[in-house]
């Protein structure tokens, strides 16, 4: 509902302010998220949360799940939770402006970029705020092995050196394939 979406939007903004509020450009980032219609985009055209506001809900699901993984799993106990939160909230920013509403009410995804969406999100975010190395790695590698076989050696090294990246990937998979699956 509209009320639920308003509450989700407020929660998202509160968490984003908590994560990046003191960084140069954070207010510009908040305004850009409004302008690019982040809060009304679907999360996917074919799979999870193919509805207006789906990207907002997905980003919150990933953020909540990632923080819970940091809290409950010893493997993530030493993660920089601020980096995890920042990366979780912003990992799919590049999806904005790429969905076309179809006559049947669904969406078609149109991506003309030559980069993967991890890289594209990192580049777009850094137009407004500086990301830490951990945030960059987490966002860049959040797709895990879905980026393709050529990346598998590097992916393993990234996850060994940056548990924040593995945490974000796991949270994204839990949100996408468990929490957001229609029954």
Residue ranges and their predicted role:
Residues 73, 106, 146-147:
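A short hydrophobic/aromatic micro-motif that marks alpha-helical segments and, especially, helix-coil
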Residues 1-102, 152:
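Acidic/His-rich, divalent-metal-binding segments that scaffold phosphate/diphosphate chemistry
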Residues 46-49, 108, 126, 154:
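A general structural-boundary detector
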Residues 56-63, 114-118, 164:
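Short alpha-helical patches at coil-to-helix transitions and adjacent helical residues
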Residues 49-53, 112, 158-161:
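Short, solvent-exposed segments of well-ordered alpha helices
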Residues 84-85, 122, 126, 130-183:
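Histidine/acidic-rich helix-loop-helix segments that form or flank divalent-metal centers
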Residues 82, 94-130:
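A contiguous pocket-lining binding segment that forms or flanks enzyme active sites
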Residues 4, 8-12, 22-28, 117, ...:
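Alpha-helical structural motif
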């Amino acid at each position: 509902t509209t009320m639920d979406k308003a509450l989700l939007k407020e929660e998202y903004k509160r968490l984003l302010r908590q994560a990046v509020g003191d960084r140069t450009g954070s207010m510009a980032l908040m305004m850009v998220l409004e302008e690019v219609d982040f809060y009304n985009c679907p999360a996917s055209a074919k799979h999870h949360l193919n509805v207006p506001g789906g990207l907002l809900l997905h980003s919150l699901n990933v953020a909540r799940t990632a923080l819970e993984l940091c809290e409950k799993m010893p493997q993530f106990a030493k993660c920089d939770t601020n980096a995890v939160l920042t990366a979780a909230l912003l990992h799919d920013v590049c999806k904005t402006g790429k969905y076309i509403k179809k006559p049947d009410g669904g969406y078609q995804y149109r991506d003309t970029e030559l980069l993967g969406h991890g890289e594209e999100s990192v580049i777009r975010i850094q137009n407004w705020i500086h990301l830490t190395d951990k945030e960059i790695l987490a966002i860049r590698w959040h797709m895990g092995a879905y980026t393709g076989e050529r990346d598998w050696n590097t992916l393993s090294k990234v996850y060994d050196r940056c548990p924040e990246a593995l945490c974000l990937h796991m949270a994204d998979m839990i949100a996408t394939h468990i929490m957001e699956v229609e029954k």
